[in-house]
């Protein structure tokens, strides 16, 4: 982890990148660099996805038919692949979101002090 503005960057838990990419595409189609930038911006620079992780994740999601990709021309006139969430991807996002909420509650429970004997 590296330091940035006094906060340490958060390493993504294994398996969360797909969820984060699906969530990002929920807000609209984006090319790979745009996905990485949105993740970084929406996490206040805490999450930074490198291309060595992002593009394999995008290809994996495309193989699962959770996203589609089409060629387009970017604002600076370069050819880019634009990724979009599919209906199957929206369903999977709901599943992933539910899992994340369960995990968050479980971790929050572990963080609380244990109940004293006789307390409920």
Regions found by a protein language model. Give the residues of each.
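Beta-hairpin "wing" of winged helix-turn-helix
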Residues: 62-78, 84
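N-terminal helix-turn-helix DNA-binding core of bacterial DNA-binding proteins
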Residues: 9-53
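Amphipathic alpha-helical dimerization/coiled-coil segments
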Residues: 2-3, 88-120
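Short, structured helix-loop boundary elements
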Residues: 10, 51, 79-82, 97, ...
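A cross-family signal for key residues in well-ordered alpha-helices
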Residues: 23, 37, 59, 94, ...
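Short, hydrophobic secondary-structure boundary micro-motifs
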Residues: 48, 70, 118-119
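Intrinsically disordered, low-complexity serine/threonine- and proline-rich regulatory segments
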Residues: 1-15, 96
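Basic amphipathic alpha-helical segments that dock to polyanions
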Residues: 54-61
């Amino acid at each position: 982890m590296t330091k940035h503005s006094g906060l340490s960057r958060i390493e993504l838990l294994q398996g969360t990148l797909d969820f984060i990419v699906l969530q990002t595409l929920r807000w609209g189609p984006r090319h790979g660099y745009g996905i990485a930038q949105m993740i970084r911006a929406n996490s206040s620079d805490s999450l930074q996805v490198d291309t060595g992780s992002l593009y394999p994740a995008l290809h994996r999601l495309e193989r699962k038919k959770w996203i589609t990709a089409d060629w387009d021309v970017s604002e600076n006139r370069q050819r880019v692949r634009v990724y979009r969430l599919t209906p199957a991807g929206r369903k999977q996002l709901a599943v992933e979101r539910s899992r994340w909420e369960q995990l968050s509650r479980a971790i929050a429970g572990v963080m609380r002090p244990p109940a004293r004997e006789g307390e409920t």
